[in-house]
Amino acid sequence: IAIVVHPNYLEKVEELCCINNFKKVGRILQGGSERYYSSLSAINAYASTENDINLIFHDSVRPLVTKRIISDCITMLGKYGAVDVAIPATDTIIKMNLNTHEIEDIPNRQFLYNGQTPQAFKLSVIREAYKRALVDPNFKTTDDCGVVLKYMPDIPIGVVPGEKFNMKLTHKEDLFLLDNLFQLKSVSDVSLYGQENALEHKVIVIFGGSYGIGHS
């Protein structure tokens, strides 16, 4: 795992990884002012790798991503050079004229999906896509799959079904929703796997008890 962070938080993230003994974190990389700078930082960090490895990009603002989604992305990379995660759009999407604030079009919702992360790629694919993008003076992007779609249109992009729980933390009220979803997920894990498995590798702290543990 490589964590790409803002330069101001490099030391803090290193400290957290050390204190919590996050052994899976192999690299902590410096990001930039634009989202794609972070992607490029990760791509360049593995550029010297001899094999065409799989790279999986995930936004930290989606903390409830599941093992199933990640596993499905890895599996689909066996067939595709690029993979996205998405769920069907449930709201009607309108195209609005920003000058007049009038509806210009209402696309067929049957073909519309809400994109999520992670997004997964063969290293050779995403590296070449950004190589082409960076020589385009009009290059703009907020999405890595969008870079592949625009600059390597011959590369098909597979789609893995996402989950509603894999929501993005964008606004303050999202913190409340995510906190409740996390608690609900924790309860579900106990019901599904049993208390013993759910508590494995966890630290239990007991508060209260006037006379201490073991008092008869």
Can you describe what each PLM-predicted range is?
Residues 1-52, 136-137:
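Conserved N-terminal catalytic core of the sugar/cofactor nucleotidyltransferase
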Residues 198-216:
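Canonical Rossmann dinucleotide-binding motif of NAD(H)/NADP(H)-dependent dehydrogenases/reductases
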